[in-house]
């Protein structure tokens, strides 16, 4: 069953292969570079991203600069995770020549390899097949070894290890602290200098604990301290998300965010975190499936990004995150929602607004608002902290992530996306928002579906948005009028609650089969969706950030 999702995705991508002139390998030149490489590269708009560093005292500016250095080490570690056969591939790219070579090299940097992340990792340079497990696992796994890995035998399903062969040829888990010793040494040296420089006690405590985590592969203590950061600098450094492991979803990929916080805007949103227990109690699932044990601290931070690296810097740029992922931390302290304001603003202006003007019916365009985009992003991240996390399946304690394996990321992103407006509508009933939020949220949400599905349905967020679009189209909530789209504002709240219910139930049950069935039914590139995306040929797919702090 695990392989079926990839077969379906390949077929679906083929339907959408002509989008923006991209996605077809026909006619590669003699150096193996896709003929449409310039169009693929042009889909990403170079955008300068800057944070106001003038608000930082000298001590914190020094700390931030050193954390940028640590972030660069995380990027190098991530590329090692993402790129198998690195020496062979890089040598071939270095030797390539021709009019499209520079574009291929630039696109290689965007994708951390020769595979296009928008189009199910199809090669845009050479003909190497992308391994589902990236470089986390050996490339020559037997069926018996795959079964052993899937079962997590001998600790091979740990988040913080690379799977390699020992001298006898047997599979062994190599801890990140050993495998990435060089990158860790660079990051630790930079974090030590940052910890000495900062005047903020919470940042110093976190960095000190993070250094120890890098040395021991034990991240719980530093994740707990990360929840308490209260200064002007917000930072994420280390192995975090598991999207890159497309084989099992076990392995954490390296990434980094170095940001400057806005305390006043963060305080404005703090009122919402007190509603999380009430929202959990009102989720549309049986009480026994709810998770009242997740912590409710859940700080909200509004920040401007100064620098990113690793997993988050590759391909599509994120606009917010909700961390940590460790369910033990979530039960003790909740999770932190971090909104990347300058990234969000750039995407609203350059991408979401042109998409809406191209695809939505004219009489609903006035309901597209930056505030609704911001609120949906906030409640998407809040929703990651709601619903089943640690569950009991067949009498054993486990986690939703472990039971859903390779499809977890797509299902979880669909849950958070759909639950975002559900939460907003519930809070509107309590008086937090005016009645107008219903149409504004529905219209902005619809435009957002088109924005995110353009990332490609092989990517978790893109596939999650395909699920939502096709589900709502099937329910008659999304209507097509002469090539443009309308959302039924009155029917939307009930339909979105139905989708939230279906996802939460399969998560509570740890039901891989039900999750796969949802993806197979709704997660493909339907004809209606493919035609809509084709009409967006002239609209930027995503930004390509150029960080001022790096200049």
Regions picked out by a protein language model, each given a short descriptive name:
Residues 176-365, 369:
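Contiguous, non-catalytic segments that form substrate-binding/exosite surfaces or channel walls
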Residues 388-414:
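Post-HEXXH active-site segment of zinc metalloproteases
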Residues 18-21:
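C-terminal motif of bacterial Sec signal peptides marking the signal peptidase cleavage site
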Residues 421-517:
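Long, well-structured alpha-helical subdomains associated
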Residues 504-551:
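Extended, compositionally biased alpha-helical segments that mediate assembly or anchoring
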Residues 200, 409-426:
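An active-site-proximal "capping" alpha-helix that borders the catalytic cofactor pocket
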Residues 375-389, 416, 421:
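Active-site recognition of the HExxH zinc-binding catalytic motif
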Residues 29-206:
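N-terminal helix-rich structural modules
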């Amino acid at each position: 069953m695990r392989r079926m999702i990839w077969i379906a995705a390949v077929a679906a991508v083929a339907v959408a292969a002509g989008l923006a002139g991209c996605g077809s390998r026909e006619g590669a030149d003699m150096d193996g570079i896709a003929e449409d490489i310039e169009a693929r590269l042009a889909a990403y708009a170079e955008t300068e991203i800057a944070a106001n560093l003038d608000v930082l005292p000298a001590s914190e500016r020094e700390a931030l600069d050193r954390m940028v250095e640590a972030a660069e080490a995380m990027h190098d570690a991530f590329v090692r995770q993402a790129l198998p056969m690195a020496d062979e591939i890089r040598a071939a790219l270095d030797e390539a020549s021709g009019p499209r070579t520079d574009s291929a090299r630039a696109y290689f940097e965007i994708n951390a390899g020769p595979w296009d992340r928008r189009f199910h990792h199809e090669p845009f340079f050479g003909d190497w097949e992308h391994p589902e497990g990236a470089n986390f696992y050996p490339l020559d796994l037997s069926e018996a070894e795959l079964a052993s890995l899937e079962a997590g035998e001998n600790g091979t399903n740990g988040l913080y290890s690379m799977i390699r062969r020992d001298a006898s040829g047997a599979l062994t888990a190599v801890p990140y602290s050993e495998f990435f010793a060089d990158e860790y040494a660079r990051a630790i040296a930079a974090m030590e200098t940052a910890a000495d420089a900062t005047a903020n006690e919470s940042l110093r405590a976190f960095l000190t604990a993070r250094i120890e985590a890098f040395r021991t592969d034990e991240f719980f203590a530093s994740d707990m301290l990360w929840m308490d950061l209260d200064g002007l600098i917000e930072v994420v450094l280390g192995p975090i998300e598991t999207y890159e492991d497309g084989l099992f979803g076990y392995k954490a990929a390296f990434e980094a965010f170095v940001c400057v916080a806005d305390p006043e805007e963060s305080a404005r949103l703090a009122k919402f975190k007190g509603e999380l227990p009430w929202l959990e109690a009102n989720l549309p699932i049986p009480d026994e499936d709810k998770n009242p044990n997740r912590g409710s601290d859940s700080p909200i931070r509004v920040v401007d990004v100064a620098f990113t690296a690793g997993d988050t810097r590759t391909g599509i740029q994120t606009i917010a995150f909700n961390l940590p992922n460790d369910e033990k931390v979530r039960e003790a302290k909740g999770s932190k929602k971090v909104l990347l304001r300058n990234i969000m603003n750039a995407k609203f202006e350059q991408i979401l607004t042109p998409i809406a003007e191209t695809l939505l019916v004219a009489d609903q365009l006035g309901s597209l608002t930056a505030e609704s985009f911001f609120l949906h992003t906030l409640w998407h991240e809040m929703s990651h902290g709601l619903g089943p996390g640690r569950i009991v399946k067949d009498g054993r304690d486990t986690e939703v992530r472990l039971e859903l394996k390779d499809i977890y990321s797509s299902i979880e992103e669909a849950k958070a996306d759909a639950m975002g407006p559900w939460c907003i509508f519930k809070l509107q009933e309590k008086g937090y928002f005016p009645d107008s939020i219903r149409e504004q949220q529905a219209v902005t949400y619809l435009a957002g579906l088109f924005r995110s599905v353009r990332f490609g349905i092989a990517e978790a967020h893109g596939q999650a948005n395909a699920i939502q679009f096709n589900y709502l189209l099937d329910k008659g909530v999304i209507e097509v009028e002469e090539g443009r789209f309308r959302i039924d504002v009155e029917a939307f709240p009930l339909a979105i609650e139905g989708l939230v219910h279906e996802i939460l139930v399969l998560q509570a049950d740890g039901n891989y089969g039900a999750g796969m069935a949802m993806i197979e039914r709704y997660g493909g590139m339907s004809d209606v969706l493919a035609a809509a995306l084709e009409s967006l040929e002239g609209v930027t797919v995503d930004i390509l950030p150029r960080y001022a702090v790096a200049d």
